[in-house]
Design a protein with these regions (language model features):
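Membrane-embedded alpha-helical bundles that constitute the cytochrome b-like, heme-associated redox core
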Residues: 2-196
């Protein structure tokens, strides 16, 4: 019974993580959705993030326990930075909301928009690094199957190279360091290209 419970918990965690990433990628293409749908998707994302945090609360409890290796230190820095970026994203979302949280009438839309632009960019980068770290155990399992190991390595290198290309081509660094106040959407391009 206990094993079944652990498997169920692990499955739910994986579903939440996949759903979070897919929703966030969709939200990055803000010009494809109406404001209302964008905000509701964002609200769903933050609900999933809260669930994700609850499921992984033991990790926070273990922060000040045990020895810190370089790998653990790197993981902790990325996770804490991701938490901070997500919190900034949540707060800024409420400040700029024109639909879901408009009834709060908090004001601060100008600073909220700036914070939202920068924090979402950092969330995207940190979330990708976070996922990369959690894929490491799966990569270790591939060592038993050499044919899959090399295939996996080639795919990983190609994805990393494409990621660097897109990062530079779309000037993503401008959003990370607030070098631009606007995110442009090329309507001549297929919408599908913005998800790659």
């Amino acid at each position: 019974m206990e094993v079944m419970k652990m498997r169920c918990r692990r499955t739910v965690k994986i579903i939440i993580d996949i759903a979070m990433y897919l929703i966030f990628v969709a939200l990055m293409q803000e010009y494809l959705w109406s404001d209302g749908l964008h905000e509701w998707l964002g609200t769903t994302l933050f609900a999933l993030f809260i669930a994700h945090t609850i499921f992984n609360f033991r990790w926070y409890q273990s922060l000040f326990k045990g020895k810190y290796t370089p790998a653990r230190t790197t993981s902790a820095i990325i996770n804490i930075a991701l938490l901070a970026a997500m919190l900034c994203c949540m707060v800024s979302s409420v400040l700029v909301s024109g639909k879901v949280f408009a009834f709060l009438n908090l004001g601060g839309a100008r600073i909220g928009r700036t914070l939202h632009l920068v924090s979402t960019a950092w969330v995207f980068v940190l979330m990708s690094l976070h996922l990369g770290l959690h894929l490491a155990p799966f990569a270790n399992k591939l060592k038993k199957h050499r044919q899959f190991l090399w295939t996996g390595r080639i795919i990983a290198v190609l994805l990393a190279a494409y990621g660097v290309y897109v990062f530079v081509d779309r000037a993503f660094y401008e959003e990370l360091f607030y070098l631009t106040e606007f995110k442009f959407f090329d309507t001549d391009k297929s919408a599908a290209l913005y998800f790659l």
